[in-house]
């Protein structure tokens, strides 16, 4: 028996859909996000539901059509599930009008709309104790209704020769075998349903180009799918596959294959048959080995095997000479093969959070890379001159490794770099002149190292915008810091600083100054010149008084002076018209607050815990900060203002 033979043709009137559904099918439907797969405007590039970009350097991938626009990420560590909830509803049936919010009443009304009022059956509602909302006694039947609507949609698809059918997000549990009659289909979107298996008849769709099955409950695929030999894009993300279904290896026309977020443990040698693949995503599975077959995929431009359990890569990876994006982050890699140097088209290489202790010198051949990120490994040094050879780099991230010194290669290695992150290493010195060619360097993170001093040429870092030197052993800031006049963020917390130079007042663009947990006793009067300052953190020092000039910080919203030795607050604090948060808790010598504090009309939070405020009645203090402010206002000479 021929599975693909057509059944009786239903009349058009019995299969008509809503006008909205028809418009969406004829016009291409509403645009979908990458996870869902719905497309828009008839454009196949955005309709295949498979435009997933890999994020080599940050969190999970963002589904966009332009891979290069989001690949470098930088956010979180883990790969987040692709968000498909923003996709507009584009179901190809009229089920949305009857199954979305109308289960109880709509089905009843369809059969009774023409009855006279006295003969219509009553719909009884019951109020449950836990809810004030009346609930119909009729049971919801959304899946049943959805499956019925699928049958209608398939009939219409057959009768009208529709080429693109979107049944996504329709609570479908079963695909009817009548799908075989939709032989004109080139695009079929079934993502975000409850499908556990596909019918054998799916193989009758011999013209199919795009098939989106992501976000279902599939554990296998029927062998008949091999007859869809024109299939180019197959999306199986977020299913329950324990292996790559063998039939996939026979789909020789595939160019894009998404298998992210399944339960796959092995990749068969038959993978070598998919020679037309340009994009392969195996992200977030349980794969421990990637065999030599990967080397046969010479047309690959994007390979994502991040968030697996790989310990090694085959040398054959060097045969994939067209690769521009290779994401290996969050595996258990112990080494990288020398053949990676053959990948001269490589722009993005994700190596974050593995178990590497070194990288091969051959990486210097990958001159197209614009970002180098090996965060979260155990690397102690880089091959001599490697960074200098990669002269297209703009971002270098070596954080959370075992570096004890800056990479060798001199100033040339940072010529075009604007962002350097060496956080959480064991570096005790920034070499003099190391940034002499880094004219574009705007962000340097040296947090959690072993620095005891800053280089004498710090005054040449004139384009620096953000400087993080927290958690080191710095004892002094050089006066030349005054030259960093583009600085907006300066983090110096957890050091051993005893004073701040007067030249700090030259940093007129500073928005954030963090001096928490040092040994500072006095702030310079020039602090009042920082008119753009929004956050000033002085917590856990030895400060006895704030300078009166602090009242000039008109943009200040956050001031923390807790855990110090304050004896009083200056009256000028009442001039901080933008102040929202004030922390003065745990100052054992602070016995009174200035009445002027009540003038801070935008103050939302005041922490005065463990301050012996003898001038304010205990019952007022017990009432909380808002009551304290009211008391100050009522007893101040400004109460009429």
UniProtKB/Swiss-Prot annotation:
Sequence ranges of Gly residues compositional bias: 26-43
UniProt repeat feature LRR, residue ranges: 161-182, 184-205, 207-228, 230-251, 253-274, 276-297, 299-320, 322-343, 345-367, 368-389, 392-413, 416-437, 440-461, 463-484, 486-507, 509-530, 532-553, 555-576, 578-600, 602-623
Keyword Repeat set for record: yes
Keyword Repeat in annotation: yes
Keywords: Leucine-rich repeat, Repeat
Biased composition (Low complexity): 1-21, 82-100
Biased composition annotated in UniProt, kind: Polar residues: 101-114
Pfam families with a match to the protein in the record: LRR_14, LRR_8
UniProt region (Disordered), positions on chain: 1-147
GO cellular component terms, A-Z: cytoplasm
PROSITE patterns: LRR (PS51450)
Function (record text): Acts as a Ras effector and participates in MAPK pathway activation. Probably acts as a regulatory subunit of protein phosphatase that specifically dephosphorylates Raf kinase and stimulate Raf activity at specialized signaling complexes upon Ras activation.
Protein family (similarity comment): Belongs to the SHOC2 family.
Protein name: Leucine-rich repeat protein soc-2 homolog
């Amino acid at each position: 028996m021929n599975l693909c033979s057509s059944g009786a043709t239903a009349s058009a009137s019995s299969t008509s859909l809503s006008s909205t559904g028809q418009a969406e099918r004829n016009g291409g439907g509403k645009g979908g996000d990458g996870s869902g797969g719905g497309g828009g405007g008839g454009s196949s590039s955005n309709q295949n539901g498979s435009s997933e970009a890999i994020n080599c350097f940050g969190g999970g991938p963002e589904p966009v059509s332009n891979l290069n626009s989001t690949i470098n990420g930088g956010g979180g560590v883990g790969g987040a599930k692709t968000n498909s909830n923003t996709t507009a509803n584009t179901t190809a049936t009229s089920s949305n009008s009857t199954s979305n919010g109308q289960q109880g009443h709509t089905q009843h009304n369809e059969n009774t709309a023409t009855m006279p009022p006295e003969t219509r059956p009553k719909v009884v509602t019951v109020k449950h104790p836990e809810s004030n909302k009346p609930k119909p006694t009729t049971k919801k039947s959304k899946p049943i209704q959805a499956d019925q609507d699928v049958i209608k949609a398939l009939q219409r698809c057959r009768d009208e020769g529709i080429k693109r059918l979107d049944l996504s997000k329709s609570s479908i549990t079963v695909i009817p075998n009548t799908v075989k009659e939709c032989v004109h289909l080139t695009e079929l979107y079934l993502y975000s349903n409850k499908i556990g298996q596909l019918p054998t008849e799916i193989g009758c769709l011999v013209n199919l180009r795009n098939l989106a099955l992501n976000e279902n409950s599939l554990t296998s695929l029927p062998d008949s799918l091999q007859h869809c030999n024109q299939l180019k894009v197959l999306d199986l993300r977020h299913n329950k596959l324990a292996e790559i279904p063998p039939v996939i290896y026979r789909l020789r026309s595939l160019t894009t294959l998404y298998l992210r977020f399944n339960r796959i443990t092995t990749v068969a040698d038959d993978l070598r048959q998919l020679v037309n693949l340009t994009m392969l995503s195996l992200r977030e599975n349980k794969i421990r080995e990637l065999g030599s077959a990967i080397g046969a995929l010479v047309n690959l431009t994007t390979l994502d095997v991040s968030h697996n359990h790989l310990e090694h890569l085959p040398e054959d990876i060097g045969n994939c000479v067209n690769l521009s994006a290779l994401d290996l982050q969050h595996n258990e890699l112990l080494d990288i093969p020398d053949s990676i140097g053959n990948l001269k088209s490589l722009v993005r290489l994700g190596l974050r959070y593995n178990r590497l202790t070194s990288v091969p010198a051959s990486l210097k051949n990958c001159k197209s890379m614009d970002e180098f990120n090996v965060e979260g490994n155990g690397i102690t040094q880089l091959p001599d001159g490697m960074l200098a050879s990669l002269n297209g780099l703009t971002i270098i991230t070596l954080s959370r490794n075992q570096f004890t010194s800056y990479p060798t290669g001199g100033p040339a290695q940072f010529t075009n770099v604007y962002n350097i992150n060496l956080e959480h290493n064991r570096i005790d010195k920034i070499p003099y002149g190391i940034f002499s060619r880094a004219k574009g360097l705007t962000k340097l993170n040296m947090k959690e190292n072993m620095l005891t001093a800053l280089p004498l040429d710090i005054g040449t870092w004139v384009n620096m915008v953000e400087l993080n030197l927290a958690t080191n052993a710095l004892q002094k800031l050089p006066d030349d810091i005054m030259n960093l006049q583009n600085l907006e963020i300066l983090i110096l917390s957890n050091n051993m600083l005893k004073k701040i130079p007067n030249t700090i007042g030259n940093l007129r663009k500073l928005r954030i100054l963090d001096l928490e947990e040092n040994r500072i006793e006095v702030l310079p009067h020039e602090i009042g010149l920082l008119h753009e300052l929004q956050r000033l953190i002085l917590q856990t020092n030895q400060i006895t008084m704030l300078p009166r000039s602090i009242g000039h910080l008109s943009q200040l919203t956050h001031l923390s002076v807790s855990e110090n030795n304050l004896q009083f607050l200056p009256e000028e604090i009442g001039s901080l018209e933008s102040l929202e948060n004030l922390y003065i808790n745990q100052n054992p010598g602070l016995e009174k607050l200035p009445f002027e504090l009540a003038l801070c009309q935008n103050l939302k939070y005041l922490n005065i815990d463990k301050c012996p405020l003898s001038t304010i009645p205990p019952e007022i203090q017990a009432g909380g900060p808002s009551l304290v402010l009211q008391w100050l206002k009522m007893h101040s000479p400004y109460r009429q203002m």
